[in-house]
């Protein structure tokens, strides 16, 4: 069993592997440190450990690194989303230090999960004293902010990984793949949540400082991500070097569950919980 903090254990775990799918968990150390930048440094080192171990795995044919765009670079230095930029630093390491591994690498951008509605900062709630029977979602960003989403990651992610592995001529050599089923606005997503959950909804934009006071630390981490998406819009899932980002259409991926179907399943599970 490999430990992303232990290079030697990773080398042992990877021995004999032909395909490696690597993902780190930013929010595990974040829950202990409550510090985004410090957690990003931990995640960066974990990713470098994984890359170094993969690079010396002689049997390796394809390396898939689950990463995210460099928000600091894309936004021209205006934003830095820790759980994005720590991962993106590993991309830079692979490109600069591991050329042989780069030839076998797909950089996979996994977008917003539909289960993120379970995060307190996203969860719509009923206002007990309100006359209207609506569920409210609070946020400090525009309701027109676009959210690219993979929907149900458990059902859809594997199709992107398989497509990348089966088409290395497109997806290897350091190519970026965007794992998204659709893009929808914040307001549109909330409306769809309401329709699938049988609730009336309303998005209420509030002051950024007030938003962060309601959910300290977590709102800072996720709030800066939403602000980044709001500011950069269609550029948010792009590479500053101009490299093409492959989509589901580019890879011919079919049979993906739609976001609406995923939210219906989520509503059914919530109702029976």
Predicted features and spans:
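A generic structural motif
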Residues: 1, 201-210
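Conserved Rossmann-fold cofactor-binding substructure of NAD(P)-dependent oxidoreductases
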Residues: 1-19
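Oxidoreductase cofactor-interface core, primarily capturing Rossmann-like NAD(P)-dependent enzymes
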Residues: 5-8, 26-42, 57-61, 69-200, ...
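CheY-like receiver
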Residues: 12-16, 53, 93
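Redox-cofactor binding/interface segments in oxidoreductases and associated redox assembly factors
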Residues: 19-22, 65
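Non-catalytic, hydrophobic alpha-helical segments
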Residues: 20, 157, 189, 259-262
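Short, conserved SAM-binding segment of the class I
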Residues: 46-49, 53
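A hydrophobic C-terminal alpha-helical subdomain
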Residues: 172, 208-273
């Amino acid at each position: 069993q490999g430990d992303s903090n232990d290079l030697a254990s990773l080398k042992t775990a990877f021995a004999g592997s032909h395909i490696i799918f690597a993902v780190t968990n930013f929010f595990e150390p974040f829950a202990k440190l409550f510090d985004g930048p410090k957690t990003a440094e931990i995640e960066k080192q974990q990713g470098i450990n994984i890359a170094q171990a993969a690079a010396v795995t002689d049997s390796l044919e394809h390396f898939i690194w689950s990463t995210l765009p460099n928000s600091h670079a894309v936004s021209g230095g205006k934003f830095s989303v820790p759980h994005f930029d720590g991962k993106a630093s590993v991309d830079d390491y692979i490109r600069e230090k591991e050329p042989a591994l780069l030839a076998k690498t797909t950089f996979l951008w996994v977008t917003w999960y539909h289960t993120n509605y379970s995060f307190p900062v996203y969860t719509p709630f009923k206002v007990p004293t309100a006359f209207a029977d609506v569920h409210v979602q609070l946020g400090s960003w525009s309701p027109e902010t676009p959210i690219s989403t993979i929907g149900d990651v458990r059902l859809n992610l594997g199709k992107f990984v398989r497509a990348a592995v089966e088409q290395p001529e497109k997806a290897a050599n350091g190519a970026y793949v965007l794992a998204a089923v659709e893009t929808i606005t914040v307001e549109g997503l909330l409306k769809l949540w309401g329709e699938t959950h049988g609730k009336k909804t309303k998005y209420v934009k509030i002051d950024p400082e007030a938003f962060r006071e309601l959910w300290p630390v977590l709102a800072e981490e996720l709030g800066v991500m939403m602000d980044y998406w709001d500011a950069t819009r269609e550029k948010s899932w792009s590479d500053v070097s101009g490299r093409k980002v492959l989509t589901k259409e580019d890879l011919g991926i079919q049979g993906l569950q739609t976001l609406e179907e995923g939210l219906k399943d989520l509503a059914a599970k919530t109702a029976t919980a």
